[in-house]
Amino acid sequence: MYWKVRKTSPEQIARQYGVHAALGISLLLNLILATTRPAMPKVSAELKVSFEQFAKQVTEHLLDTSYISYSDSTVALLRDELAPAVVKQLQDSEMLAKSDDDLRATAKTLTEERQVCAVKIKSIDPSELTPNGMLPVEVKGLVAIHSAQESGPTGPVNFDFKFLIGGKVGADGKPAYAADGKTPLPVVANFQDASTKPQ
C-alpha cells in the first residue's frame, strides 16, 4: 500500500493551530493581569463611620434654614466642609450665600419670619472608595420648614444628596488630619442634588 507523505508548511500549522495558540496566550495574559493588578483601596470601618457622620453634618448644614443656626451652619460649610469648586457650584445654584451681605440678609429674613426647620435623615449609604481614594456617600431624608408667616412648603420635602468625600488638604499641600493625627479631615469634593423636585 502506498502512503502519501504530507508536507506541512508553517503556514498550514499556523492556520490549523493559530486560534488555539492565540486563545492560550490571551488566557495567560489575562491571568497575569488579574493577579498583578493593584488592589482597590479599602476604607477602614472607623473612616467610613467618620465620613458618614460628616455627610450627615453637611446635609444638615445645607438644609438649615432655622433663624437660630443658619449663619453658623453656612459659615461652617464655606470655611471647613466644602471644597472651593463645590462652594462655587452651590452659590451659583443659590443653595449657599454668595457673599457676607447675602448671608446677613438671609439671616435677617429668617429671624423676622421666625423660620425653623427639621431634618430627618432616612438613610446614609456609602459606596466603595473610588480609585483616587474618595468615598461616594448618598444621603436621603426629609426636611420640614415652618415659619410664623407660613412661607415655604406646606409639608415635608424629600431630599437625595450625593457627596464625594475626600481628605482635606492643608495650605502646605499635605493632607490635613484630626487632632488624633490619624483620621483625615473630610471635605466634600463633589456634590449632586438628586432630589425629585416637588410638583
Describe these PLM feature segments.
Residues 2-20, 37-45, 49, 64, ...:
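Structured, amphipathic secondary-structure segments that form assembly/contact surfaces
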Residues 18-35:
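Hydrophobic membrane-insertion alpha-helices, especially the h-region
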Residues 26-28, 56, 75-76:
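Active-site-proximal helix/loop capping residues that flank conserved catalytic or ligand/cofactor
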Residues 55-66:
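N-terminal alpha-helical signal peptides/signal-anchor transmembrane segments
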